[in-house]
């Protein structure tokens, strides 16, 4: 059914919701999990243009991805730390990495975060050509 599940994570409690679900799905289908975090701060958006060294924030993002890998024993898990606009990067990576499913969490009603994250979810789900699994964060 699924061979590669791209899971968008954001270093928040919402990640646990989506990972708990995807862990079971990947085990049932023997799918690889591709954990993707998109760093979208100013330094991340200009990282390549300015040839910057990794900031502490980017190092922390890499460490977080490795923690998530360690929390998924027995599963095939790879990671990708992308930099830039979250929606554009997720759309690009779904295609480049040949994901069969995109899994993301949505948030409750936190106005400002809903405006930002809601825009990402809306854009991504309309632009990718694979099924999108959306789970509301607990």
What residues fall within each predicted segment?
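A short acidic, glycine-rich active-site loop
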Residues: 51-63
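Gly/Ser-rich helix-loop-strand patches that form or flank binding pockets
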Residues: 93-138
């Amino acid at each position: 059914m699924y061979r590669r599940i791209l899971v968008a994570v954001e270093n928040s409690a919402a990640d646990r919701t989506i990972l708990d679900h995807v862990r079971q799905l990947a085990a049932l289908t023997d799918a690889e999990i591709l954990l993707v975090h998109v760093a979208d701060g100013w330094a991340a958006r200009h990282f390549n243009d300015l040839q910057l060294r990794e900031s502490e924030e980017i190092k922390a993002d890499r460490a977080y991805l490795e923690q998530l890998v360690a929390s998924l024993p027995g599963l095939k898990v790879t990671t990708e730390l992308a930099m830039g606009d979250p929606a554009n990067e997720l759309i690009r990576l779904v295609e480049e990495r040949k994901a069969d499913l995109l899994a993301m969490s949505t948030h409750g009603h936190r106005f400002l975060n809903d405006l930002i994250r809601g825009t990402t979810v809306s854009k991504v789900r309309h632009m990718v050509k694979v099924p999108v699994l959306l789970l509301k964060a607990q």
